[in-house]
A protein has these predicted regions:
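N-terminal leader/linker segments that initiate helical-solenoid repeat arrays
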Residues: 17-71, 75
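Register position in tetratricopeptide repeats
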Residues: 29, 59, 93-94, 127-128, ...
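Conserved structural position within tetratricopeptide repeats
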Residues: 41-45, 72-75, 106-109, 139-143, ...
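Canonical tetratricopeptide repeat
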Residues: 52, 86, 120-123, 154, ...
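Conserved small/polar residues in nucleotide/adenosyl-binding loops
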Residues: 205-206
Length: 206
């Protein structure tokens, strides 16, 4: 009898934990994010539950809280690219493009061949007006893929930010030759021509 009672006492926490997990899963499925956050204990150390909590907080636009949870996960495992990208997105949504760039860079260093990480890293640098680093990052991209129209387009934006219109035009021109249907590239070239009152040249591209 004593062994049976002991066994029941041991099984109770496991059963309770499973019940709570089921409740969290069901709440997520039903988009009941407030319940998700409530069910996960403040001192929870389970990484999967903390990721779920961060997702729920993010869905409710509670970005500073989500950032806190995600940073605690990075302290435990700095190589988790999924957490790094979630953290970068939260920083972006709070207008902190520089910190977002740092997260994308860490993810990019872990997976150098991942084009999405590299693209978001450069976009975040441009958004934070860190044009010199964006220029360097674009050259790094083009060393890997010299045919990338997008790489040259962002290089042009970096040069524009650095007030180097000639280099910006050369970069946009290469991007245009690789992808003449990119409306943003065409608009950037037209903008340079208009600023220099080269209206006839502008018409050639538009």
């Amino acid at each position: 009898m004593k062994k049976f009672v002991t066994l029941l006492l041991c099984m109770l926490p496991v059963s309770l934990f499973a019940h709570v997990n089921d409740g969290i899963r069901q709440a997520m499925d039903n988009y009941d994010y407030e319940t998700v956050v409530t069910l996960i204990e403040p001192d929870c150390q389970d990484s999967l539950l903390l990721i779920t909590k961060a997702q729920a907080l993010k869905a409710m636009n509670r970005y500073p809280e989500a950032i806190g949870v995600l940073n605690s996960l990075i302290l435990k495992d700095s190589t988790n690219t999924k957490v790094l990208i979630d953290l970068a997105e939260c920083y972006k949504l709070t207008g902190n493009s520089r910190r977002a760039a740092n997260c994308y860079q860490k993810a990019m260093n872990l997976q150098p061949e991942n084009k999405f990480f590299r693209l978001q890293f450069i976009r975040s640098l441009l958004a934070s007006e860190d044009y010199e680093e964006a220029r360097t990052a674009c050259h790094g991209w083009l060393e890997r893929d010299s045919l990338s129209a997008t790489g040259y387009k962002y290089l042009g934006q970096a040069y524009e930010g650095l007030q180097d219109a000639a280099s910006a035009f050369l970069s946009y021109n290469i991007a245009y030759r690789r992808d003449s249907l990119d409306a943003q590239t065409v608009a950037r070239i037209a903008g340079i021509f208009n600023n220099n009152q080269q209206f006839k040249d502008c018409l050639l591209y538009t």
